[in-house]
Amino acid sequence: MLVSYKWLKELVDVDVTTAELAEKMSTTGIEVEGVETPAEGLSKLVVGHIVSCEDVPDTHLHLCQVDTGDDELRQVVCGAPNVKTGINVIVAVPGARIADNYKIKKGKIRGMESLGMICSLQELGLSESIIPKEFSDGIQILPEGAIPGDSIFSYLDLDDEIIELSITPNRADALSMRGVAHEVAAIYGKKVHFEEKNLIEEAERAADKISVVIESDKVLSYSARIVKNVTVAPSPQWLQNKLMNAGIRPINNVVDVTNYVLLTYGQPMHAFDFDKFDGTTIVARNAENGEKLITLDGEERDLIADDLVIAVNDQPVALAGVMGGQSTEIGSSSKTVVLEAAVFNGTSIRKTSGRLNLRSESSSRFEKGINYDTVSEAMDFAAAMLQELAGGQVLSGQVTEGVLPTEPVEVSTTLGYVNTRLGTELTYTDIEEVFEKLGFAISGSEVKFTVLVPRRRWDIAIQADLVEEIARIYGYEKLPTTLPEAGATAGELTSMQRLRRRVRTVAEGAGLSEIITYALTTPEKAVQFSTQATNITELMWPMTVDRSALRQNVVSGMLDTIAYNVARKNSNLAVYEIGKVFEQTGNPKEDLPTEVETFTFALTGLVEEKDFQTKSKPVDFFYAKGIVEALFIKLKLDVTFVAQKGLASMHPGRTATILLDGKEIGFVGQVHPQTAKQYDIPETYVAEINLSTIESQMNQALIFEDITKYPSVSRDIALLLAESVSHHDIVSAIETSGVKRLTAIKLFDVYAGNNIAEGYKSMAYSLTFQNPNDNLTDEEVAKYMEKITKSLVEKVNAEIR
């Protein structure tokens, strides 16, 4: 929002520097982006009256004699196409500075002396987008009353100061000059004084000419007025100046009046050429799918049913709240004007303007909110201006459909509530002074008071909003600084937080790097690596298909990360994530999923790269399994690894499930080569472990056992076995032998080859025995070994070597 300081001072008596005002507004809730002066850097620019203008033969140049208030006429050579005798222009005399700090000097053009330069607004640094189209390709023509020799700054309001405000959505009331004036008046304790117009209506009724119908619940109110016998012409210079300083291009007096009212009241308006209507009934309705409309910018718009249009004779003539239609555009020959002032649903306008990429000053205000209280007043103000500036005759009455609430909103609170939240000791009198500055009526007492909030401040609805207003106007800098007095409770980590930290320590100690992947994925990937897939929880309105379902595993997202890195030549990767997966056992549309904390890692490439003295070492199953084992050693939990051939997307010969007390808590293994090919990644090993289940085990109390003073005894045993027998099978056979004093089983050798029959292998184990209360004898150990040997022979058909 660009605010003219000259214009602001017409609405409220404020006499401070713009720097001070900017600082004050920023500290009370409306951020000021900056302050600019259009005249900054410009100098020696005066009004010139062209006494004579002669064409230079065989050129586009003109030799002008210009009165600049000096004793003699000034000769200036000008190439502008619209220069002519009798007009007032902008003259940069020798020594003047124009845009880009360019200095004007005396010179000769085609042998003709030129004592200055006749300037366009572009040459003064004004943007092309705000310059009237009739002057966009030529020089600026000043009003007839301009006095030669006077500085041009006051004529064009270039000496104004423009304050740029950054308006947040909750303070859309400041998207108008009246709204800003109310804010400044409250800050400085001043009164606003707004211009009032005396509207004279004809006896002829507007309702006899047109009718209004609302056919959409997205249209809250629609009002129309008719002004006849208007003369379309350029606006007076003062109006053009105000619009240009606000960043709006002047068009003609009719369109400029609607834009002036937009800036003044924050009420978007539109003007139709009534003579171009094919009917007399104005209908505000939803568009039809496939309906088309050519807007004022000349673009044909394809409409959908969610768009709002203004239609006459079932033909759209405007895109409601966004832009008018070309078919009813105000032109130089327009005589009868229909003024529109309406309130449309902000969400609908935002969707339409966003879909069509068509943002406008009107759509911006409808999106953020409109002051219901001044819709009718703004309409009458615009009609009165057309009387003044276009000689129009206003037909009697507004034709209105829809009723808007205009009564103030009542919000109640207590003095104690205010002081508790601000840490102040304000009195009821202090509160009254604040709301008097804001222009809000207040009644009640220190026990409880009620504030009548005018409709212009639609952001205030609850007592917390009142507290904010009190703090803003009273002054944030006046609020006392105190330390919190509430008693503190010593905090501690939850069991899951402790577990996560211990897992993170092990993972990073193993050289893994933490990543965070998306919790949303495709429905297929959501269950791809799940050991027990549940119902899929899908979003009703996903942003993309790739992010439409809550994951039930982390591995699939981690493989996407692996693929992304491998595609960029980063092939040695070791990553992990501690995150949630979402299991849904109920109805996904009615029940929330269960969040399960998991630890997942992925390895690919080389553990060690080749150098002059060592060979490269690729990642394998045992390296991945070793990380898992290191984790459970750190957690002091005993787990069992069981070969798993049926896990989807995993290699059937290099995958194991992880059991804790007989319950499956995860898996570790190689991604199936076909799955790896789908992800376009090399050989990769992954593991996923359920931390939520582990947490419940971690909470069990530990029982202390005395450290025994008696030594342990070890025995080795070598077995000849079929290749199909796994390490787990052997350990299970040993553990089920019934030997109570067995404390450790360690595999220290595996061999297959020479002297071993085909289809067989040799495995050697070290078995440790210990009695915590006495020394073991050789006879006892021999009995234990006999039991173990018998169990191995019976259960896995082992041959003792």
Curated annotation (Swiss-Prot):
One GO MF term: magnesium ion binding
Limits of the tRNA-binding domain: 39-153
Cofactors demanded by this protein: Mg(2+)
Localization annotation: Cytoplasm
Gene: pheT
FDX-ACB domain location: 708-801
Taxonomic source organism: Streptococcus agalactiae serotype V (strain ATCC BAA-611 / 2603 V/R)
Domain of life: Bacteria
Protein name stated in the entry: Phenylalanine--tRNA ligase beta subunit
Family, per entry: Belongs to the phenylalanyl-tRNA synthetase beta subunit family. Type 1 subfamily.
Subunit: Tetramer of two alpha and two beta subunits.
EC number(s) recorded for this UniProt protein: 6.1.1.20
Cofactor info, note text: Binds 2 magnesium ions per tetramer.
Pfam families assigned to the protein according to its UniProt record, in alphabetical order: B3_4 (PF03483), B5 (PF03484), FDX-ACB (PF03147), tRNA_bind (PF01588), tRNA_synthFbeta (PF17759)
Residues that bind Mg(2+): 459, 465, 468-469
